[in-house]
Amino acid sequence: REGFSGMARWMQKQSAEEIGHAYAIAEYMIKREATPKVDKVDVVPQGWGNPVEVFEHALEHEKHVSKLIDELVQVASEEKDNATQNFLWQFVREQVEEEANVLNIVSRLRKAGDSAILFIDAKLGERES
């Protein structure tokens, strides 16, 4: 809505990736004779003051997801469920990358300030996957 089409494209790609992760987890659960259940999803804010705030929010969310995955690994470990631990480690590694990517964007946006935000927008719009 604010004209940052590159950032919007980046977020759309990110969203599609996260949906893929949800499907992977559901498929794994079915293989293990568990029933996937989607509960209510927290309401996402509908507006921010500027793009930095958007990506700061995304960074906090990635940290939250990392914590949840870590907790699942811990439960699997306590249950001596090696298969699930192995499955979850891919997400542990993924979260390290996710947090680093978003932190990098936040850092760049903070350093660039308003004068270079359109350049960063264009760069984010180049994301392929």
Write out the residue ranges for each language-model feature.
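Iron-associated oxidoreductase/ferritin-like identity signal
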Residues: R1-S129
